[in-house]
Swiss-Prot record:
Catalyzes the deamination of dCTP to dUTP. Pathway: Pyrimidine metabolism; dUMP biosynthesis; dUMP from dCTP (dUTP route): step 1/2. GO terms for biological process: dUMP biosynthetic process; dUTP biosynthetic process. Keywords: Hydrolase, Nucleotide metabolism, Nucleotide-binding. The lineage of its organism: Archaea, Thermoproteota, Thermoprotei, Sulfolobales, Sulfolobaceae. Belongs to the dCTP deaminase family. The active site is at residue 123. PANTHER family: DCTP DEAMINASE (PTHR42680:SF3). It comes from Acidianus ambivalens. It is an enzyme of class 3 (hydrolase). This is dCTP deaminase.
């Protein structure tokens, strides 16, 4: 079941879903808009090969600021301004707001698991031309879905509680 605006307001009022900071204008008909945060990670251009065990920080440049330019075909990691906390019976789909998609930006399919909490780090692919984005701009849209029953294994992974743009944390198997 997708949560509509009335449901979302109720869940937020009860503290079952937490979005902080939250402004009422970001609650939409069937979801909540999230804003661009103050940090971005750019992939460094390098011939170095990433392999298991290497520190991923050597492959990124992290910038802090109030505005960022996403260059043509660039792949960046962007953090949301908001901290999100979901209960064990709600998950969310992350979508790019259509105005940014119409500029050619792209966000791959992304899910926020039931039980997750933290700022969201989202992959963004650049357009055919540079696009400037500003901190605080409504950029993403979260659509919340309630599961029929609480999940048996809520999210407790390595990205739980993340703050700021978060680089990959995994090992190849």
């Amino acid at each position: 079941m997708i949560l509509g605006d009335r449901d979302l307001k109720y869940y937020l009022e009860k503290g079952w879903i937490v979005i902080s900071p939250l402004t009422q204008d970001t609650i939409r008909e069937n979801g909540v808009d999230l804003r661009v945060g103050g940090e971005i990670a750019r992939f460094k251009k390098t011939d170095e090969i990433y392999e298991d065990g290497k520190d991923p920080r050597s492959f990124y440049e992290i910038e802090k600021g109030d505005e960022f330019i996403i260059y043509p075909n660039e792949h960046v990691l962007l953090v949301t301004e908001e901290y999100v906390k979901l209960p064990n019976d709600v998950m969310a789909f992350v979508n790019l707001r259509s105005s940014f998609a119409r500029l050619g930006l792209f966000v791959p399919p992304t899910i926020v698991d039931a039980g997750f909490e933290g700022q969201l780090t989202i992959e963004v692919l650049g357009s055919a031309f540079p696009v400037k984005i500003k901190r605080g701009t409504r950029f993403l849209h979260l659509i919340f879905a309630r599961t029929l029953t609480p999940v048996e294994n809520p999210y407790h992974g390595k990205y739980q509680g993340q703050q700021g743009v978060t680089l990959p944390k995994f090992k190849f198997r």
